[in-house]
């Protein structure tokens, strides 16, 4: 598609899979970066859930894809020798085509057991007197004793308003600012072939920042 086809909503950012449907299918299995789930449920439980999701991805079409890992990597020792710290992580790289197929297979497995309502804006979310959640939409009101909200970046402002209405405290996440430097693939091939993607930290000797 060379230009916008004027679809009712942007299918690249919304819908089943959201923005992730057309990503390169990279899944980081680590507590070192990418989120702070471990702060709420503990590091061990967080890792168990990440591996659980990884198992589902593999079972739904990701079999045969490579799981890269920093464990026992010679680059970790090389980093330490140069005052650098290689963050521990495993990375499952599905690739765009397989990632889309995994999501397609997931939808096929779920559609007979779950009611999907697309293009259904949630106007308000409240808690009833008996502790149930009530979601008001333009297609009616849905209630349930458990509610999972996963709106991504496109719904972050709406999510903030929901938290305010339910008196849920919020805080801003840290934003890492960096410089993107592109080099020929041959330069980084020894690293990317083994780790695919690595996070390397350098702390200044004087201020440790």
Which ranges hold each PLM region?
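Residues forming the flavin
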Residues: 1-36, 68-209
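A general alpha-helix detector
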Residues: 52-56
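Short, surface-exposed, low-complexity cationic segments
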Residues: 34-51
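N-terminal entrance/gating region of PLP-dependent enzymes' catalytic architecture
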Residues: 14, 39, 58
